[in-house]
UniProtKB/Swiss-Prot annotation:
Pathway: Glycolipid biosynthesis; 4-amino-4-deoxy-alpha-L-arabinose undecaprenyl phosphate biosynthesis; 4-amino-4-deoxy-alpha-L-arabinose undecaprenyl phosphate from UDP-4-deoxy-4-formamido-beta-L-arabinose and undecaprenyl phosphate: step 2/2; Bacterial outer membrane biogenesis; lipopolysaccharide biosynthesis. It comes from Salmonella paratyphi C (strain RKS4594). Residues 2-260 form the NodB homology domain. InterPro entries: ArnD, Glyco_hydro/deAcase_b/a-brl, NODB_dom, Polysacc_deacetylase_ArnD. Its EC number is 3.5.1.n3. The gene is arnD. This is Probable 4-deoxy-4-formamido-L-arabinose-phosphoundecaprenol deformylase ArnD. HAMAP family: ArnD. Keywords: Antibiotic resistance, Hydrolase, Lipid A biosynthesis, Lipid biosynthesis, Lipid metabolism, Lipopolysaccharide biosynthesis. Belongs to the polysaccharide deacetylase family. ArnD deformylase subfamily. One of its GO terms (cellular component) is membrane.
Length: 299
């Protein structure tokens, strides 16, 4: 049996309002639990449209047919009008999710984090994280124990900024296996659970067709030599591609794959995890930099 961590990112108002309820119903039908990471502040995702001037981002949007994939309400959110507060508008849905699934913070403002966190100071990072955690805890009525950086925009500064929140783990980067980030010689931070597998929008196109994606990604899960972690998005697999995701759950079960919340991947003694660090890097299919796992020495 292959155990795969299932991470569900919720970036937008529509993803929370429409995608999450469908995903909850789908997961319930198949007896699967996952980790949901919510954006809880303003939905300003439409402000990413300026990035269309960048060839790699434009190609990604064309390759994934973004208008039909996400919908124009997502693509224009926060452009001609102020972005609506996601958490306030969908508190009931978020609370229901936290009743059945591991629930953590994705971002206060997904667009702001993805656009500006790379040059924020440690204090600005801490204030933004605190704002999101405070809002999410007020909604779910219990402590937030995990987080996942929006767009995988993370580096050593983000690791340090999250240390004061006493989280059980973070999932801030792409990599191969769980690790303890090295803060300084002799001091390690909160365990990291990297995403190891590509997302739908990173690979779909000429190389991998939509109808063959499930077969392709299951093969990648079975071949993963580290600790497999797969990310879906409420805006994609929870709405337009919900039937495809349901088919994936069936095929994965038949292939001997068991999905689980990311927290279940942690060992009883996190001190046994290898050391590592998060550095800025790039991966195929995703525009811009993101946090990538790198080995580190204890000395």
């Amino acid at each position: 049996m292959t155990k795969v961590g299932l991470r569900i990112d919720v970036d937008t108002l529509r993803g929370t309002r429409e995608g999450v309820p469908r995903l909850l119903a789908t997961l319930h039908r198949h007896g699967v639990q996952a980790s949901f990471f919510f954006s809880v502040g303003p939905d300003n995702m439409g402000r990413h449209l300026w990035r269309l001037i960048r060839p790699r981002f434009l190609w990604k949007m064309l390759r994934s047919n973004a208008a039909s994939l996400y919908g124009w309400d997502i693509l224009l959110a926060g452009t001609a009008w102020p972005g609506k507060n996601i958490g306030n508008a969908n508190a009931g849905i978020i609370r229901e999710t936290a009743t059945y699934h591991e629930t953590g913070l994705h971002a206060w403002d997904h667009h702001a984090w993805q656009t500006h966190s790379g040059h924020w100071s440690i204090r600005q990072l801490e204030e933004d994280i605190a704002r999101g955690i405070t809002a999410l805890e007020a909604i779910i009525g219990k402590p937030v124990t995990c987080s996942a950086a929006a767009g995988w925009r993370a580096d050593g500064r983000v690791v340090r900024a999250k240390e004061s929140f006493n989280l059980r783990y973070n999932s801030d980067c792409r990599g191969t296996t769980l690790f303890r980030p090295l803060l300084m010689p002799g001091q390690t931070g909160t365990p990291q659970i990297p995403v190891t597998l590509p997302t739908w929008d990173e690979v779909i196109g000429p190389a991998v067709q939509a109808q063959s994606f499930n077969t392709w990604i299951i093969s990648r899960m079975l071949q993963d030599k580290g600790t497999p972690v797969y990310t879906i998005h409420a805006e994609v697999e929870g709405i337009v591609h919900q039937p495809l995701f349901e088919d994936l759950l069936v095929r994965a079960r038949d292939a001997g794959i068991t999905f689980c919340p990311l927290g279940e991947l942690l060992p009883a003694s996190p001190e046994s995890l290898p050391l590592g660090q998060i550095v800025r890097g790039h991966i195929p299919g995703r525009e811009g930099w993101l946090g990538c796992q790198q080995a580190a020495s204890a000395s």
